[in-house]
């Protein structure tokens, strides 16, 4: 699907405005500018996304999140600038979304269950992609892109504007902006450095058939067929000893290896230095875990 898009849905709102939108139909738009129209009597809403500009309103923010989770667009293909300024912080409850600041006014005797205080809802409350498994639905935000065959285990987390090509095994954290190539595995507790906070400005990606060991992490991109040893965090500034041939090595910044395929990153257990060398074998997923999602 390409822009311009006309989206139809039903919104949840209070006296201050729109809280959430549940979209159900997407068509080509004939409008010339971004706009939305809401029927006050039925809460039905029509949104026109013509230009992929910075987000200015809640309905457009929700539409862009939907478009990723429905696999119409991949991470980093839409502009999400301003989304944190536009979306309110909400309590996601068994009675639907409500403003977090209003919780103190509620009757404490009410049977109210609060699942989260966040600007983004769990994806599975609004979109169920075909062919995925999510062990804990609260750990995948709306706006995540999960390719068919993806398995998210209990400790896995996927932010908005991030995701997987599928099939993939995810037991670690996929930060905003990060995209994981097919047949790659993120081990338990591993981390991918995003661009929402801190000093990292580069968008991180992981290629195909990669393995990030348990409690490892990356601040650089990986090409295809790479492995990060368990417990090793490779940031852009990490000094890496590249073993080129037997007896030949070169010390370089990890950033200069970003995107390189076929490397094994590990820490020398005798010297403590971080090393990289060409891999002798390739990694494969257990297909049985992903074919019947």
Regions found by a protein language model. Give the residues of each.
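A generic secondary-structure signal marking the coil-to-beta-strand transition
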Residues: 17, 130, 136, 148, ...
